[in-house]
């Protein structure tokens, strides 16, 4: 039985590896997987990072307000609002000036746009990190890496990082908080200390794509770095609403930055870079009725993530890296290949997780698992225990 499973998984692993190479440093989409493996039934998507409870909330609004009323026809056939109009919509909720808001087709579009500006000539990054930050830099741009230590759980030493920046003198510094792929978090207090020391850096990009899943008190208060943008003129904040709302397919994000940078961008495009469905979801962000329910979904998800992480800690011989995001990075026993576990999860259980094999700076056999609903998380834990037990 085990030998049959191993043979089937080995064959699948080779085919999946080829598909992964075509996808670059990102995971193959669900559609690409279904196309290559027609008989594969993916039951749980624990690869892509979004809040499943928020997904259901947004779908409920879309169903009631767009589908049942036939309003979706206007959303699909009419031009969406332009960037300047949507800036004013977001300003109501963020309490910042409209001219300081840039709305993007997902956070990735914003990252690419920021890193390909002519003035960006030297970028400082921590590794491991989100691959787009070193893939999207402009031609001729130098990238310097600050390696996070595996022995310290890839946590962030602000003092050492400041020394590194002072020595390297980059014009652009990137901070992902919580970090991807390990979920390490830097508190708001420590962030203030860091930014004061790095006041000499022309621009600091703070990517908060996962900040809604972090917390600093028992009330799980929603964290915001808008105050950082107000206090430090060199700071640019990047946010992903796709992850917050659980709507990765819509592609929606925004950034807070100097109005002059936004004016320069809008001179060369980005007039209608958000589609009609994206605009509808964006307008939910400023509605009190939606935000009240979203806050309930956000806290429900955080509580489930805490329970899920505790359950993962109970798996024998697996190391669980501390995380304040909606995902967890696991280090497998050295005798077990991550590729085998990923294939076994997909083939035998229909669970899709992320390999860390292509992540610069990650040591050992590691996988990343996104948190899902309680029922789905229970299935993930059960499947992992079974696979690792059979692999002894």
Curated annotation (Swiss-Prot):
GO molecular function (one): pyridoxal phosphate binding
UniProt effect for mutating residue 242 to T: Increased enzyme activity with of L-threonine phosphate and a decreased activity with L-serine phosphate. Exhibits similar activity rates with both substrates
Sites where the protein binds O-phospho-L-serine: 180, 354, 368
Record-linked Pfam families: Aminotran_1_2
GO BP, sorted A to Z: biosynthetic process
Taxonomy, superkingdom: Bacteria
EC id: 4.1.1.-
Cofactor requirement: pyridoxal 5'-phosphate
Enzyme class (EC, first level): lyase
Record text on subunit structure and interactions: Homodimer.
Family, per entry: Belongs to the class-II pyridoxal-phosphate-dependent aminotransferase family.
The protein's role, per its UniProt record: Pyridoxal phosphate (PLP)-dependent decarboxylase involved in the biosynthesis of norcobamides, cofactors in the tetrachloroethene reductive dehalogenase PceA of S.multivorans. Catalyzes the decarboxylation of L-serine O-phosphate to ethanolamine O-phosphate, the precursor for the linkage between the nucleotide loop and the corrin ring in norcobamide. Less active with L-threonine phosphate. No activity with L-serine or L-threonine. Has no aminotransferase activity as no production of L-glutamate with L-histidinol phosphate and 2-oxoglutarate as substrates.
Protein name, entry field: L-serine phosphate decarboxylase
Lineage: Bacteria, Pseudomonadati, Campylobacterota, Epsilonproteobacteria, Campylobacterales
């Amino acid at each position: 039985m085990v030998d049959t499973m191993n043979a089937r998984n080995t064959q699948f692993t080779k085919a999946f590896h080829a598909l992964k190479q075509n996808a670059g440093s990102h995971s193959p989409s669900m559609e690409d997987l279904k196309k290559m493996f027609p008989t594969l039934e993916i039951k749980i998507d624990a690869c892509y990072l979004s809040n499943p409870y928020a997904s259901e909330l947004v779908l409920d609004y879309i169903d009631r307000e767009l589908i049942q009323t036939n309003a979706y026809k206007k959303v699909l056939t009419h031009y969406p609002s332009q960037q300047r109009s949507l800036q004013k919509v977001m300003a109501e909720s963020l309490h910042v000036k409209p001219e300081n808001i840039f709305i993007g087709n997902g956070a990735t579009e914003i990252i690419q746009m920021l890193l390909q500006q002519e003035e960006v000539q030297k970028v400082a990054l921590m590794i491991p990190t989100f691959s787009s930050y070193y893939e999207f830099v402009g031609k001729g741009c130098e990238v310097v890496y600050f390696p996070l230590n595996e022995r310290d759980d890839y946590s962030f030493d602000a003092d050492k990082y400041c020394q590194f920046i002072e020595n390297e003198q980059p014009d652009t510094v990137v901070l992902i908080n919580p970090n991807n792929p390990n979920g390490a978090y830097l508190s708001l207090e420590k962030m203030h200390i860091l930014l004061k020391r790095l006041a000499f850096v022309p621009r600091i990009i703070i990517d908060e794509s996962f900040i809604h899943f972090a917390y600093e008190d028992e009330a799980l208060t929603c964290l915001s770095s808008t105050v950082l943008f107000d206090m430090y003129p060199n700071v640019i904040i990047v946010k992903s609403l796709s992850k917050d709302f659980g709507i990765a397919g819509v592609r929606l994000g925004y950034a807070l930055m100097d109005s002059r940078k936004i004016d320069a961008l809008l001179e060369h495009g980005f007039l209608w870079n958000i589609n009609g469905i994206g605009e509808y979801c964006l307008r939910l962000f400023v509605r009190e009725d939606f935000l009240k329910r979203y806050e309930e979904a956000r806290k429900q998800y955080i509580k489930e993530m805490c329970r899920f992480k505790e359950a993962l800690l109970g798996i024998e011989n697996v190391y669980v890296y501390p995380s304040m995001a909606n995902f967890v990075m696991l280090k497998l026993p050295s005798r077990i290949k991550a590729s085998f576990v990923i294939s076994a999860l997909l083939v035998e259980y229909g669970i899709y997780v992320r390999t860390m094999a292509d992540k610069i700076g990650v040591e050992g056999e590691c996988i990343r698992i996104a948190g899902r609903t309680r029922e789905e998380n229970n299935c993930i834990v059960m499947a992992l225990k079974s696979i690792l037990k059979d692999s002894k």
